[in-house]
Amino acid sequence: TPLGPARSLPQSFLLKCLEQVRKIQADGAELQERLCATHKLCHPEELVLLGHSLGIPQAPLSSCSSQSLQLTSCLDQLHGGLFLYQGLLQALAGISPELAPTLDTLQLDVTDFATNIWLQMEDLGVAPAVQPTQGTMPTFTSAFQRRAGGVLVASQLQRFLGLAYRGLRYLAEP
């Protein structure tokens, strides 16, 4: 069954993951709130076209839905997605001095979560032979693009984490 190895995930790992997801969601929400309050960029849906023109990629997480949950590919997609968001958050560097600490915290928490997933994949013997490499990241040429990118990346990260949280909770059920 696709769920077979899921039951071998340590409960402590799952609980730590759920805690990390909640922390990153709080960090992301803070970034979104500050971009809204400071720069009046409050509606990611209004920036979708700009996101396409900037080439902001999205991370899939289809292997973690409860209907098609497959542990190895779910962990792989989760790690790959977090790795993608690490790169996107780095691309936002210089967004604004007042947002830098929030962005730094978000980056560190995403990196910690990605590392946690990778170590668990190694423990299970399912980690790829090499760590993924960062693809082409968008280049933000103006302060507005960087701030709009921040809204879009934070919004996409929240959606990604929502899916991750549901998948992990499903795995954590006895």
Curated annotation (Swiss-Prot):
Family the UniProt entry places it in: Belongs to the IL-6 superfamily.
GO terms of biological process kind: immune response; positive regulation of myeloid cell differentiation
Coiled-coil regions listed in the entry: none
GO CC, any one term: extracellular space
InterPro entries found in the cross-reference section: 4_helix_cytokine-like_core, GCSF/MGF, IL-6/GCSF/MGF, IL6/GCSF/MGF_CS
Quaternary structure and partners: Monomer.
Disulfide-bond pairs as recorded: 36-42, 64-74
Posttranslational modification: O-glycosylated.
Keywords for this protein: Cytokine, Disulfide bond, Glycoprotein, Growth factor, Secreted
Gene name of the record: CSF3
Localization annotation: Secreted
Domain of life: Eukaryota
PROSITE patterns given in the database record: INTERLEUKIN_6 (PS00254)
Carbohydrate attachment residues: 133
GO molecular function: cytokine activity; granulocyte colony-stimulating factor receptor binding; growth factor activity
Biological role: Granulocyte/macrophage colony-stimulating factors are cytokines that act in hematopoiesis by controlling the production, differentiation, and function of 2 related white cell populations of the blood, the granulocytes and the monocytes-macrophages. This CSF induces granulocytes.
Name of the protein this chain belongs to: Granulocyte colony-stimulating factor
